[in-house]
């Protein structure tokens, strides 16, 4: 239990360092979200099929109640009842189409989770970032209940409950509850709860925010209060 607490504190500190420009402290939001005894109550599960590479590594991590499929690596992380689906990862020899480029994939793609805390989070699809074709990474990140990370490498971010990051590389961002972001890339932003933002550069930019007073009737997340 002591090691779990040390790892938990380490992850919080790393996320806070990444979010320092927002003056955002994740600690009050994540304390007591998951009782510590539940983190040691459940097993982790790894799926084996004849169609996906058998490659799973985890080190200094807790995988309580989480499911994994495909090529995955977890380091210094806490996962609680999360689904890490590697069934759509790119394979060595594939060609990735990006704009006018056809980029060859040099190795089987891997989901890499490092220094992160994922709570009931779904991670699936594959990295759509042409700069990281073989690595679908989630680093120094905390995601809360029912977050959906769809083909989106993430570094140094905090994701509120019921938020979705879709086909977007994200660095050093805060994503409010019940938000949907599909913009290709976002950096150093604090996105309000209930935001729907879809952008294709030079094509369109759609932005909508649910009224907070109405949103709070359905999903409310604040310091010290579980969603």
List PLM regions with ranges.
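Terminal amphipathic alpha-helical/low-complexity segments used for targeting or macromolecular assembly
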Residues: 1-139, 146, 151-153, 162, ...
């Amino acid at each position: 239990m002591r090691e779990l607490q040390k790892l938990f504190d380490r992850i919080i500190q790393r996320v806070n360092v990444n979010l320092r420009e927002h003056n955002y402290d994740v600690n009050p939001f994540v304390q007591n979200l998951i009782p510590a005894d539940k983190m040691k109550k459940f097993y982790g599960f790894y799926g084996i099929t004849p169609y996906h590479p058998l490659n799973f590594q985890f080190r200094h991590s807790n995988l309580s109640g989480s499911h994994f499929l495909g090529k995955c690596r977890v380091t210094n992380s806490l996962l609680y009842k999360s689904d890490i689906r590697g069934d759509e990862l790119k394979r060595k020899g594939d060609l990735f189409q990006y704009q006018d480029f056809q980029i060859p994939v040099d190795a089987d793609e891997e989901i890499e989770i490092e220094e992160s805390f994922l709570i009931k989070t779904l991670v699936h699809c594959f990295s759509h970032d042409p700069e990281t074709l073989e690595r679908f990474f989630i680093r120094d990140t905390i995601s809360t209940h029912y977050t959906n990370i769809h083909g989106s490498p993430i570094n140094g971010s905090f994701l509120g409950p019921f938020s979705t990051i879709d086909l977007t590389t994200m660095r050093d961002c805060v994503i409010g509850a019940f938000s949907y972001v599909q913009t290709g890339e976002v950096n150093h932003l604090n996105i309000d709860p209930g935001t729907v933002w879809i952008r294709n550069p030079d094509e369109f930019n759609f932005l909508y925010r649910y009224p907070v007073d109405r949103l709070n009737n359905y999903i409310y997340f604040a310091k010290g209060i579980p969603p």
